[in-house]
């Protein structure tokens, strides 16, 4: 049930050129479709190590037999985080304002295959209650080059590795609202 599809467009041994598509657009990378492709390869040919050449960069993928089931994983392209400038339009589209944001996690743009904004909301009530216009958000995403999701999070406890994070990944490019 995920809206992205991976296509293997070329292959040289364990090195494969892979392209990803949502229902409405090509996207540079999709983790779910990467795992599904690795599992399909392992089921057809046996477990192994692969390199997927993607628009986002090379992604190392492994598929192994785990007690009769195929388990797959990958190492993402090098992640990058940068400051988010001029958030007023995005916040307005989400029905949020600066007072709704969690000061422990400044607004940022993150990359691990696709650029996307990360918005941390201070309270669970605002996190559960915000809404947005999918078409207007899609237009902003197209303008800003965000081909993946807009990630909105709420951290109820300490901001730390292993902590609980509530997340909504808004994906109008994939027709998920």
Describe the residue ranges of each PLM region.
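Active-site proximal loop and beta-alpha junction motif in alpha/beta enzyme cores
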Residues: 1-29, 35-177
């Amino acid at each position: 049930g995920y809206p992205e599809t991976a296509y293997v467009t070329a292959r040289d041994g364990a090195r494969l050129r892979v392209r990803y598509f949502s229902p409405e657009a090509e996207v540079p990378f999709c983790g779910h479709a990467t795992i599904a492709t690795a599992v399909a390869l392992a089921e057809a040919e046996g477990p192994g190590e692969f390199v997927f050449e993607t628009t986002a960069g090379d992604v190392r993928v492994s598929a192994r037999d785990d007690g009769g089931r195929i388990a797959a994983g990958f190492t993402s392209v090098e992640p990058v985080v940068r400051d988010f400038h001029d958030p007023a339009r995005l916040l307005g589209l989400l029905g949020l304002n600066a007072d709704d944001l969690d000061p422990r996690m400044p607004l940022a743009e993150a990359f691990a295959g696709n650029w996307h904004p990360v918005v941390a909301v201070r309270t669970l009530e605002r996190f559960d209650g915000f809404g947005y216009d999918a078409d207007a958000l899609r237009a902003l995403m197209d303008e800003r080059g965000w081909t993946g999701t807009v990630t909105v999070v709420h951290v109820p406890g300490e901001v730390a590795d292993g902590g609980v994070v509530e997340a909504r990944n808004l994906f109008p490019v994939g027709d998920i609202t």
